[in-house]
Amino acid sequence: MRAIILNGHGGVDALEYVENFPNPECGKDDVVVRVKSTSLNYHDIFTRNGMPGIKISMPMICGLDVAGEIAEIGVNVSGWKIGERVLIDPRNRVEGGLVGETIHGGLAEYCRVKEHQLVSIPDGVSFDQASSLPVAYGTAHRMMMTIG
């Protein structure tokens, strides 16, 4: 699959576009999402820059804010269907992971997550609008409430 991978810390030169990154395998408890939109946020920049406290294995596909369609569902997953429009909550508190940090993120064609990380996208909300909600919206909201 096509992806933008992080091979090391630094500026934009630390990012590499590849066309042959392995597709994620759908485990029995996983959902694979076909990425339709992703937005960049402060955490993606901190990860790329190597901010202390953010530990990742390289190469890593960054991108916390992801929206797309369900492409594959594990056998233990229920309540979701192929083609359903979803956004991904990047936090994975059950397994201690974070999309784009310990789990490959949305700067790729596909992203694998756990079902509890999925949120349905309501009718009338575009993929671009949905992909700005998980982290980018919270950052903007906090700034507006703090600074005014």
Regions found by a protein language model. Give the residues of each.
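Extreme N-terminal starter segment of soluble prokaryotic enzymes
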Residues: 1-2
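Residue-level signal for short segments within beta-strands and strand-turn junctions
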Residues: 5-8, 49, 70
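Short polar catalytic/cofactor-binding loops
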Residues: 7-11, 38-40
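Short gly/ser/thr-rich secondary-structure transition/capping motifs
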Residues: 12-18, 51-52
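Well-ordered beta-strand positions in beta-sheet-rich domains
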Residues: 17-20, 110
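Glycine-rich beta-strand-centered segment in the early N-terminal region that forms part
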Residues: 22-39, 51-92, 122-125
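Cytochrome P450 core scaffold surrounding the K-helix E-X-X-R motif
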Residues: 43-49
